[in-house]
């Protein structure tokens, strides 16, 4: 088998050994685990050697070759001079095409005992195997080293010697499989054309997955060097009485083939030049293997070693070369309000290893792990999709009529609808006017009219019921005074905002607790102990937010303790809101359900009294004894 045929076979075998043949190649769409094409890493890069033949002056050198029957031919001699290209044998000759330029070689200076050949790479690469073809007899001893930190530290790949034990004190892999030293490639025959072959993933390495941590540790390199430690003579020289020994005292190498590929963790099938790298132009130096991956599977980095900025919802993983699983990075759910996210292991574990992405620097006035809610001082505009940049609108609470939250100097609105918390006697979604029966819009809200009827909302002067009067005092327009530096708060916190109080002209004839049979005869749907949190004038009706502290009775309704909304009889029906429910106070309320809407109604048929423990015990006694 010829030299070229041997090289082709070795390249194919090494690709199989590296476990890469089952992975999608450069012509695939990289839908599964994939890898860039393999090639000679020495092509287009500078090979360094300590010396070169004729580097100081013209030198005469000789070499032997054998016939097919291993009989010696007469030596051939020639001259070398590094200053003349047709007589030079530089290190770059080892990295030209072994097929197009098979008879070019590097040669050391005469009578050199130790020599070094080194390849420096501009990035991390996957190295699979080395093939060296010598023009001189192969060394009696040499070492192949690698570096993974750009030459700061080195680690041996393999020792080569005619006698491993005598030279290095190591066992021979000819005797012990997997030993780090071998005598397979140290025979002086053939005197020219002898090969040294090293496979980075020879047994005992498990090569099922070429992207596993163990395999990466074995294959990743930034530098590769060969230390030639001991020359040996061609046996033909012993029988040649006319030979001059010093003419044969050199190392010479035809080819230095470093087979490998761009290192992409199984997430790319093509690579680009590393920034700043310029390949060396040399005869036959085609198809340079570059080192910067064109990442797929939502990965990023020179080696696809981390997830792309908005794809950190699961931990980054290398692709699985055994199963072909791409292990894609997954997009974070940021609702269109963030450009980047990060992976949080605590969030990941709390979700049962389903989602760990946390959005960074939420935009468009949003906040939260997924930018899923509006910031304090903004509310959700339900007319816009939440992914829209203008989905969160600034609160427009009037700075005078709106209530200030405890421990804060800023007024916030309900983030779900933009409603503002009003001061006592103030009404409107933006708290910008006095309620009916109130006057004097100011820093303390609005004051009740001190009249039998209504009053002027500006002056408080009593007016007759027949007067043509504007019941609402509109306040001039204003601009939001939201301060973004204020601390955030939760709307659900218990607050005592303004109540919807009746005016002086309104009479609320509320139910009293008298005859138990009359109380039971009302057939109330619910009986509750509540605390008034806030009340809101909606124009056509009112809503009272309460905290249910105890459920004394609940028929068909499923009422739980917690926050709920009550719906008093509309002021448009009576000119005021009845019964009276003031914020911060506790009441015992018995009422009915609106069968059409399921709302809890409070009207003139309802029983509403300030809560007292004795009242609660009495009502419970009636419910258990009489209302059965």
UniProtKB/Swiss-Prot annotation:
User: Which CDD domains does the record associate with it?
Assistant: EGF_Lam (cd00055), NTR_netrin-4_like (cd03578)
Disulfide connectivity for this sequence is: 262-271, 264-293, 295-304, 307-329, 332-341, 334-359, 362-371, 374-392, 395-413, 397-420, 422-431, 434-446, 506-576, 520-627
Please report the stretch or stretches of sequence annotated as the NTR domain. Answer: 506-627
Key words, A-Z? Basement membrane, Disulfide bond, Extracellular matrix, Glycoprotein, Laminin EGF-like domain, Repeat, Secreted, Signal
Q: Which residues are glycosylated?
A: 56, 163, 353, 483
Q: Where are the transmembrane segments?
A: none
Question: Where is the Laminin EGF-like domain positioned along the sequence?
Answer: 262-331, 332-394, 395-448
GO biological process, any: neuron remodeling
SMART domains the record matches: C345C, EGF_Lam, LamNT
Q: In what residue span(s) does the Laminin N-terminal domain sit?
A: 30-261
- Pfam families (UniProt xref): EGF_laminin, EGF_LMN_ATRN, Laminin_N, NTR
Q: Which GO terms describe its molecular function?
A: laminin-1 binding
Give the subcellular location: Secreted, Extracellular space, Extracellular matrix, Basement membrane
List the InterPro entries hit by this protein, alphabetically: Laminin/Netrin_ECM, Laminin_N, LE_dom, LMN_ATRN_NET-like_EGF, Netrin-4_NTR, Netrin_domain, Netrin_module_non-TIMP, TIMP-like_OB-fold
- Provide the tissue specificity: Expressed in kidney, liver, heart, ovary, testis, retina, brain, olfactory bulb, and widely expressed in embryo.
A GO cellular component term found in this entry reads: basement membrane
Q: Is Transcription regulation found in the keyword set?
A: no
Its signal peptide is: 1-19
Chief location bin: secreted
Function description: May play an important role in neural, kidney and vascular development. Promotes neurite elongation from olfactory bulb explants.
- Output this protein's name: Netrin-4
| Name of the gene this protein is made from | Ntn4
